[in-house]
Amino acid sequence: MAAAADERSPEDGEDEEEEEQLVLVELSGIIDSDFLSKCENKCKVLGIDTERPILQVDSCVFAGEYEDTLGTCVIFEENVEHADTEGNNKTVLKYKCHTMKKLSMTRTLLTEKKEGEENIGGVEWLQIKDNDFSYRPNMICNFLHENEDEEVVASAPDKSLELEEEEIQMNDSSNLSCEQEKPMHLEIEDSGPLIDIPSETEGSVFMETQMLP
């Protein structure tokens, strides 16, 4: 751990001290073993002083959090020295620094955030087509929220309830139609036998109806 002093202008008359801390970064989710050697020791860090910083190395993005190590992490650097006149090289390890803080980073896939979309936590699902071993951008990331889970589970009982209500309504309507038909039959039966009207009366009745204005 090293401390560096950053002096302000003489007008302020105050000194501001910035504390520096060495952190061991562990990257997980890398497929290529030569990934770090190809990135030329360049990276971008976002939110390094937050609980969950984000690290970008080449085209890969990592997210993680700080942890305390079980022991002390000692870091050495390699120095290559010529051991003999035959040209055999000998690698010598030289102490560089040590730390007890670790930053565990995991490979993360980012999705575009739409305007007006709220930041709601959820489960990230990665869907890959069968027998598709192409590069990672073919993965589709979507978030499934707890409310959506409850809606999916509750949809089946709702459908069964709707079907039951429709059956009850149909039964009620059929019962009403039967009840309405029964009194009609009773009235016809109670009205007594039909009286045959002679043909002459039928004609007179017909003529009278024709003469009405």
Curated annotation (Swiss-Prot):
It comes from the Eukaryota. The keyword DNA-binding applies. One of its GO terms (molecular function) is RNA polymerase III general transcription initiation factor activity. Its main location: nucleus. Keywords: Acetylation, DNA-binding, Nucleus, Phosphoprotein, Transcription. Residues 1-11 have a biased composition (Basic and acidic residues). The modification Phosphoserine is found at S9. Belongs to the TFIIIC subunit 6 family. Part of the TFIIIC subcomplex TFIIIC2, consisting of six subunits, GTF3C1, GTF3C2, GTF3C3, GTF3C4, GTF3C5 and GTF3C6. Interacts with GTF3C4 and GTF3C5. Involved in RNA polymerase III-mediated transcription. Integral, tightly associated component of the DNA-binding TFIIIC2 subcomplex that directly binds tRNA and virus-associated RNA promoters. This is General transcription factor 3C polypeptide 6.
